[in-house]
Amino acid sequence: MNRITQKLQEDKKILSIYFSAGYPNLNDTVQIIQDLEKNGVDLIEIGLPFSDPLADGPTIQASSTQALHNGMTTQILFDQLQNIRESVKIPLIIMGYFNPMLQYGVEAFCKKCAEIGIDGLIIPDLPVDVYADEYKAIFEKYGLINVFLITPQTSDERIRFIDSVSNGFIYMVSSASVTGSQSGFGNVQETYFERISNLNLKNPQIVGFGISNKETFNQATKYAKGAIIGSAFIKHLSESGSGKIQEFVGEIR
């Protein structure tokens, strides 16, 4: 069974953390992953930096740009993660844009992910229809879960289609804006969370965008299986370096 599926079956709210691979320094990636697991994080999203990130807010864009400047590439990330399963047991997801995956070769990329123990992918600019028609069989061949994003603007019909081709969780974007642009949730988000809850989807949902502290984590997980923190963690890395992860996670849990 895929590690993501196993984790989702646990009777707890999932804390997922996103960071850009190769940030703050090129070789910080593995240490950050190990420290996040050690401090009780349930799931890690490793951002593969890309030069034209559509959905990312300024904080994640800046970290991605710095990581590219540091020399991060798809191959270097794979090399860094080659032995990650010797020390890390929790689910790992690579989040990135489709272009670098296409350049590497979709099947070669999926094969490499499976070899090193990556459990899933999040590719915001890969349309679900294209995935279902052209790539689903490849992902499944290598045991990878593909996670799709939904927003308040996504129709119920589209959400049900996404649910039907998904086999892990659905990434529930809390607003239609870019990451890191909110603090807290208002009535609009609460109505949206309730709407999704009432659809009774087969896949659990994890909320992302706008989660930055204990309050927003607890608010989001009232309606969902878990929540993802990205921009706030990257800000913490930029201000405190990779040595104070315990402090950050301790304030959420």
Swiss-Prot record:
Keywords: Amino-acid biosynthesis, Aromatic amino acid biosynthesis, Lyase, Tryptophan biosynthesis. GO terms for cellular component: cytosol. PROSITE patterns: TRP_SYNTHASE_ALPHA. Its EC number is 4.2.1.20. It is an enzyme of class 4 (lyase). It comes from the Bacteria. Coiled coil: none annotated. Pathway: Amino-acid biosynthesis; L-tryptophan biosynthesis; L-tryptophan from chorismate: step 5/5. One of its GO terms (molecular function) is tryptophan synthase activity. SUPFAM superfamilies: Ribulose-phoshate binding barrel (SSF51366). It catalyses: (1S,2R)-1-C-(indol-3-yl)glycerol 3-phosphate + L-serine = D-glyceraldehyde 3-phosphate + L-tryptophan + H2O. Signal peptide: none annotated. The active site is at residues 45, 56. The alpha subunit is responsible for the aldol cleavage of indoleglycerol phosphate to indole and glyceraldehyde 3-phosphate. Belongs to the TrpA family. Tetramer of two alpha and two beta chains. NCBIfam families: trpA. This is Tryptophan synthase alpha chain. The lineage of its organism: Bacteria, Pseudomonadati, Bacteroidota, Flavobacteriia, Flavobacteriales. The gene is trpA.
